[in-house]
Amino acid sequence: TVCRDKQENLWQIAFRGVNDQPFWAAFSDAPKDDKERADIINRMIRIQLAMIKKATGEEDPFVRMTFYDELSDLLAKGYLQPPTGKNMLWTFVAGRRDHYPYDDLVSFDTTKQVKLGYYMNLQFTSTGAHLAPAEGPWKMEANYRYVNTRGPLTFSVVNAGNLREFVMEMSANARMMWDMQAYNTDSFLIDFCSQYFGQKYAEEVAKLYHDYYYAYWQQKLSEFPGMERQFIFQDLRYSRVFDQIGKRFSDFSPNPLYDIGFERVPGRSFRIDGNNQVDSLIAGMKKTAVRFEEVSQRCENLLKRLPKQDQRFFRDNLAA
């Protein structure tokens, strides 16, 4: 239908399994070796590309491939060999659980004839902040600034399923994509707060947003050069901690937490530094609870002073 009606289309090639898992999780006879797995993907995506070329009649149709989870690992190892071309769009994906430029992007050969894309989860049910924003616009900017050093950004995706709580972060990304050179997160935040809460309260609200994000427990020191808050203990991690500890409440262990299913990197589900998870959790929660309590109290005090028409959005997007 797309070809018959001559609709512009950005085609996608991929080979993954059911439920957003690697294909070898779906096929019992799949190879066990990473290189052999990548060889199968390499063949499959070239078959798909040939089908697209035949259907469109174009030698260089606009096609993208997204390097998600296992694909990014295979690409970083050099096993995955995606097609190249002037209209081929390689979409790199921020690291799972904690969102930062991953190894495949860091090692990307910038001489390849491809266009560059980036996919970052601001909110995602299984891999990051879920009901409360946590990444923040500063971290978003740091990600995209780095991406742009690897080549001109052609395509961008920010993922968020729960929109209400993530409006500010998504707005920041939209502003940055509109004019990356001029964008500055601190300036954007003042503009955003002026628009929704008035100039009188803009600086006060902007400071609250900043202090909210920096109240999160950073359970592991940053490893990516120049990136603040690379690892943060967002709400999805809290939820999983309560679930896992609850199931083993009667049997004490200093390390009761375990990786979620299909976790490819050991320890990535929680990324807690140290050899005693319980002690680390208690120490981390003591610090972050005080910071969040202070931000919460300031929010409540400001809420009473805001114009009535601005209170609901303030409550939904920040105070709650």
Which residues does each predicted region cover?
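Catalytic alpha/beta active-site cores
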Residues: T1-R64, L75-N87, G161
